[in-house]
């Protein structure tokens, strides 16, 4: 409990009273009495401070924001507290700039925190110059033309230049400079209509996440004459189960650019950070928005190329264990080359192209074999669509240095912070707060100690205090519970060569540091159990009660980790195979389901999707070989999955499961075969029942079969079956409405009571709700994001009048409504706003 004694009244008393108080037969009675007064006085003191802070929009409590808005005459909105606060804070400044493009863009950013760009579409209409009044700034003939108007310059209202791929790549984007004929059709959601009154407001909904300093996957060497080609996949996931010869089976990553305005605003401090109206920084410039990198604009030397806006190259001291001298730039992709082998080189930078090193964007589906012109020495080729980088060097020594020492900082896109992402994280709280800075806080850096994770787990079987293991980088860390250094900390349950479980004497937290996304590569499944379950001797009731209390408090928490399978991971095994603890928490993690589409030939014959693998297989009984331990273990382990992405969860009824703002993927999207189970029992998924389950904002790709279920805001893409339909209630959910396969008849769903839910195949047909996702493939930018074609009831009639599913907490429906309300107030007469999502 927080101590509220802000003013020490007892210490302010004259010393004579304190002396007499200490000399009483029962000493310090006055001090005890004043302690109660001090506590109440502290509450009053704190409340007075809060009342002062509530006078200012930058520091007031959330509930005060609409009252300050009333003083300004601002209409009330609902949604994310940050956006509402920014909307009120900038009210006066935006009113002064009402009707300008800058005000509209800033208003859109305040209400959504998305990238925004406004275009007056009348400027893109076809237009002919008056022969007697030619515009020099728009390409008038000499002597009316300006020197800045080059051969490749796009003329307003003119024809398309076909000789510059970098400029052509802008066609159909928010920065399209080409001319179009007038489009008189009525506006449609997300459609661009080029006409005089239309103002297009382009919005980048996907967030850009930057992984700072990771190791790319070296593929192999190639040769182009005397030039050595060094091939890398940017995605650090090695996929060791894929043989080296089958390179097309590895996982691509779509490279994104960073949002410069977000990065700029993140560097501002204090209350000034909220006041965006005073920022002179442009909100959305070409090549500086959080969208996919355009391949054609990466080519150096092209008239419209801008590789310096997407890519930077620097050298670093490879002998440094902490990489403190590493300079992270603001671009989407940064290559860090070893200083010893590449010292003194001149790299391409803005307005200063390198004399020797060149940059090119190209399709690297066949690596250097498909390049025209061929790969040259001191050339870097980037394929942002597949996430590949190719270097051309003239010596094998340099090629070896790149293979062993190259580091990359790259950016990718995702709908929001569900799964493992490099996001800011607060210090450990609750059960682990006391250990965040004490002797049980263990920091892991791969370059300082490659076996640091194993060392951090030393003595967890003896330490009764909570242990915090924080991984402070974004490299790949191997964890093997069968490692020789963990012999004392693990148990094989008396079976020689059997699976080993990590023994715990107190709570354990393994987390990513703030703004990091480490990869945890397992050599065998994770298994957890108490270090001691039965008292010694078993008849010692006091000791047994103490052990029972310790086991009930035994919590394992994984936070911010991307958990994958390693080289020797047993085939068919789940990532987590045992949780004989009080509570297992998976927070902001990705328990890699795989299921991705690997590198492969271009459409129309894309490669097949990789199989999906189980995330958990937790059985009852709980894996104790000694009957006495199994009998004494009284806990019903709680499994909590919060804002995470997992593969199938096969868990028996002896556990409880809580899913919040998460995605559970069995590889079965809308319209796919419904045979795979996403949540079910650990034995036979088709006949066993899963645990009692609570859901809140979850998207489930696959069938669900549980003992009972309650909650709200879930999307069940396939059938949901609850054994006990008399227990629990589901609200604001989507059910598939699937039918049982013949010869059986009737609905496949077995549902408890439900309220305000919709079905994909409802009767009558007009009541059915269409469900569509931007992508159903893990790792793709729009994974599990609801598409615009989804029924509005799914997008806007979930909990709190927002969307159902894993991303409902983002309040996107509120953002769209708030934009429409504010634009009606800010739009000039005769101007029609078109809201167009780019991602």
Would you name each region that the model predicts?
Residues 427, 513, 521-539, 587-635, ...:
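Acidic/polar low-complexity surface segments
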Residues 493-574, 594, 599, 610-613:
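Right-handed parallel beta-helix/beta-spiral solenoid domain characteristic of secreted/periplasmic
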Residues 116, 381-388, 393-416, 720-763:
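C-terminal, active-site-flanking charged/polar segments
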Residues 1-437:
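Compositionally biased, low-complexity/repeat regions
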Residues 739, 744-839:
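Extracellular/surface-exposed low-complexity segments
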């Amino acid at each position: 409990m927080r101590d509220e004694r802000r003013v020490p009244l007892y210490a302010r008393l004259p010393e004579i009273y304190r002396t007499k108080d200490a000399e009483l037969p029962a000493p310090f009675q006055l001090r005890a009495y004043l302690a109660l007064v001090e506590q109440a006085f502290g509450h009053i003191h704190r409340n007075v401070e809060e009342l002062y802070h509530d006078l200012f929009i930058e520091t007031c409590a959330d509930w005060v924001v609409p009252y300050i808005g009333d003083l300004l005459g601002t209409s009330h909105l609902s949604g994310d507290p940050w956006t509402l606060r920014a909307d009120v804070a900038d009210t006066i400044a935006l009113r002064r700039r009402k009707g300008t493009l800058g005000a509209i863009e800033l208003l859109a950013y305040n209400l959504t925190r998305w990238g925004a760009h406004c275009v007056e579409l009348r400027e893109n209409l076809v237009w002919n110059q008056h022969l007697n009044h030619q515009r020099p700034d728009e390409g008038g003939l000499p002597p009316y033309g300006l020197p800045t108007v080059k051969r490749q310059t796009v003329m307003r209202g003119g024809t398309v230049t076909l000789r510059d791929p970098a400029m052509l790549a802008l066609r159909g984007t928010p920065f399209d400079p080409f001319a179009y004929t007038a489009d008189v059709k009525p506006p449609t959601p997300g459609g661009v209509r080029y006409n005089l009154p239309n103002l297009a407001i382009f919005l980048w909904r996907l967030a850009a996440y930057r992984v700072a300093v990771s190791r790319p996957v070296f593929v192999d060497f190639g040769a182009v004459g005397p030039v050595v080609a060094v091939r890398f996949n940017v995605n650090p996931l090695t996929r060791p189960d894929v043989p080296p010869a089958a390179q097309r089976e590895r996982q691509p990553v779509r490279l994104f650019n960073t949002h410069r305005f977000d990065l700029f605003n993140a560097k501002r401090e204090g209350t000034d950070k909220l006041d965006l109206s005073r920022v002179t920084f442009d909100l959305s410039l070409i090549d500086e928005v959080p969208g996919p990198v355009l391949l054609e604009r990466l080519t150096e030397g092209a008239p419209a190329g801008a590789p310096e806006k997407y890519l930077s190259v620097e050298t670093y001291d490879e002998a440094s264990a902490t990489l403190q001298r590493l300079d992270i730039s603001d671009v989407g992709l940064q290559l860090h080359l070893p200083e010893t082998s590449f010292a003194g080189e001149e790299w391409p930078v803005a307005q200063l192209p390198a004399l020797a090193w060149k940059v090119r964007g190209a399709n690297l589906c066949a690596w250097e074999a498909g390049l025209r012109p061929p790969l040259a020495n001191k050339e870097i080729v980037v394929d942002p669509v597949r996430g590949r980088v190719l270097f051309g060097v003239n010596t094998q020594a340099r090629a070896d240095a790149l293979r062993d020492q190259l580091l990359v900082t790259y950016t990718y896109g995702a709908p929001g912070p569900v799964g493992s992402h490099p996001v800011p994280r607060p210090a450990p709280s609750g059960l682990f707060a006391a250990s965040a800075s004490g002797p049980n806080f263990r920091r892991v850096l791969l370059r300082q100690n490659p076996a640091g994770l194993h060392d951090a787990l030393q003595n967890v079987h003896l330490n009764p205090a909570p242990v915090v293991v924080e991984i402070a980088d974004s490299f790949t860390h191997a964890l093997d519970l069968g490692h020789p250094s963990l012999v004392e900390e693990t148990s094989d349950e008396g079976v020689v060569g059997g699976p080993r479980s990590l023994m715990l004497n107190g709570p354990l937290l393994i987390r990513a540091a703030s703004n990091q996304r480490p990869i945890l590569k397992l050599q065998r499944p994770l298994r957890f159990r108490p270090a001691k379950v039965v008292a010694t001797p078993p008849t010692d009731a006091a000791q047994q009660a103490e052990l029972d209390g310790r086991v009930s408090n035994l919590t394992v928490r994984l936070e911010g980790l991307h958990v994958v399978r390693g080289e020797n991971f047993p085939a068919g095994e789940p990532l987590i195979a045992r949780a004989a603890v009080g509570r297992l928490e998976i927070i902001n993690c990705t328990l890699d389901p795989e299921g991705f589409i690997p590198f492969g030939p271009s459409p129309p014959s894309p490669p097949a999707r990789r199989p999906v693998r189980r995330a958990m297989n937790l059985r009852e009984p709980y894996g104790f070989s000694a009957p006495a331990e199994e009998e004494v273990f009284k806990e019903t382990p709680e499994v909590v999955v919060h804002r995470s992405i997992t593969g199938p969860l096969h868990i028996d009824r002896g556990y409880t499961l809580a899913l919040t703002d998460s995605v559970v993927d069995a590889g079965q999207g809308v319209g796919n075969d419904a045979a795979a189970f996403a949540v079910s029992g650990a034995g036979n998924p088709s006949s066993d029942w899963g645990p009692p389950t609570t859901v809140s904002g979850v998207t489930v790709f696959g069938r669900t079969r549980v003992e009972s279920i309650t909650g709200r805001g879930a999307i069940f893409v396939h059938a949901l079956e609850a054994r006990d339909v008399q227990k629990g209630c589901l609200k604001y959910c989507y059910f598939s409405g699937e039918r049982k396969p013949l010869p059986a008849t009737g609905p496949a769903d077995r549902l408890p009571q439900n309220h305000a839910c919709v079905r994909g195949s409802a009767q009558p047909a007009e009541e059915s709700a269409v469900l569509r996702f931007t992508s159903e493939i893990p790792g793709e930018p729009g994974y599990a994001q609801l598409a615009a074609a989804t029924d509005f009831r799914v997008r806007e009639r979930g909990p709190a009048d927002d969307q159902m599913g894993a991303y409902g907490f983002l309040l996107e429906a509120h953002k769209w409504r708030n934009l429409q309300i504010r634009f009606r107030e800010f739009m000039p007469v005769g101007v029609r706003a078109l809201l167009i999502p780019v991602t």
